[in-house]
C-alpha cells in the first residue's frame, strides 16, 4: 500500500518553543517543523540537550534573521552542585574529581562573582558543538581524543545568586552570544576551590523576547490537532526586528531597496536598520553608513 506524502507549506514567522530536556535543539526544530508542516525552518543557536527553555524557531522568511537572534543577549537560570567536576561540566558527564566544599555564605559567593562579569576570556567545554577542523569538539571527545578547547572572549552582563543551600546553589545569568554557562559554573567552582558543575539549566529569554509566551512541543501538537491555524501559533517576523531602529521608505524608494539598490539620504539613522513600507510591512534589513548610504543586507519576500 502506498503511503500518502505529507504536504509541507510555506510558513513565515517565529515559534517561541519551550524546549524539553533530553533532546538536541535540532531535534526540537525538526519535530516542530514536522508538526507545523513547514517547508523551511531554522533555530537561533543551540541549547544543550540537558537544558530547557526558550528556543526561538524561525520559519520561512524569518530564517533570514535567525543569525541575528543567535547573536542577541540571553538569560539563564542554572542549578549548580559544588564539590564535583565532570567531563562535560554538567550532570551528564563522568565524574572527574570530588573535593570538599568549604563553608560558604551568600556574601562569600557574591564577593567572587564579579570576577566572572564583563568582557572575560572563557574556555569552551570539550563537549560542545564548536568545530575544529570541520568537526564538532564533542565528536572528538567521544572518540577519546585529546581536545584543546578554544579560549574565547565573551561578555557576561550580570550574575545573581538566587539560592545558596550548600553544596547546591542557583544562579541567574544574563550574557552575550557565545557564552557557555557550563564554563561559567566550572570557573566559579575553581574560584571557590571546590569545583562545580551544572545539574539543570533553563533559558529564560532571548532578546528581543524578554517576556516570552512559550509553547511546549506537546502544547503545539495539541493546538494543531484541535484545528488551530499554524500561522496563529507563530509570531510575525516583525517581532524579531524589535531591537533595530525602524526606517520607513516611500513606494519609489522601497522598490529600489527591494531590488538591492543602495539609497542615500543624510536623514537616515546611522547603523543597522529595519526597513518598512509606509503601511508597516517589513522589507528587509540594511546598514546606513556615516554618509547616509543605506546598503540592503537582507531582503524579505512578504
Swiss-Prot record:
Q: Which InterPro entries match?
A: PsdUridine_synth_cat_dom_sf, PsdUridine_synth_N, PUA-like_sf, tRNA_psdUridine_synth_TruB, tRNA_sdUridine_synth_fam1_C, TruB_C
Q: Which Gene3D superfamilies match?
A: Pseudouridine synthase
* HAMAP family in UniProt: TruB_bact (MF_01080)
Known catalysed reaction(s)?
Answer: uridine(55) in tRNA = pseudouridine(55) in tRNA
Judging by the UniProt lineage, the source's domain of life is Bacteria
Sorted alphabetically, which Pfam families does this protein's record hold?
Answer: TruB-C_2 (PF09157), TruB_C_2 (PF16198), TruB_N (PF01509)
The name on file for this protein is: tRNA pseudouridine synthase B
Query: Enzyme group, top EC level?
Result: isomerase
Source organism: Xylella fastidiosa (strain 9a5c)
Residues the record marks as active site: 48 (nucleophile)
Q: Which UniProt keywords apply?
A: Isomerase, tRNA processing
Cite the source lineage: Bacteria, Pseudomonadati, Pseudomonadota, Gammaproteobacteria, Lysobacterales
What residues form the membrane-spanning segments?
A: none
Q: Which NCBIfam families match?
A: TruB
**Per the similarity annotation, which family is this?**
Belongs to the pseudouridine synthase TruB family. Type 1 subfamily.
> GO:BP terms for this protein?
mRNA pseudouridine synthesis; tRNA pseudouridine synthesis
The EC number(s) attached to this protein equal 5.4.99.25
Task: Give a short account of what the protein does.
Answer: Responsible for synthesis of pseudouridine from uracil-55 in the psi GC loop of transfer RNAs.
Molecular function per GO: RNA binding; tRNA pseudouridine(55) synthase activity
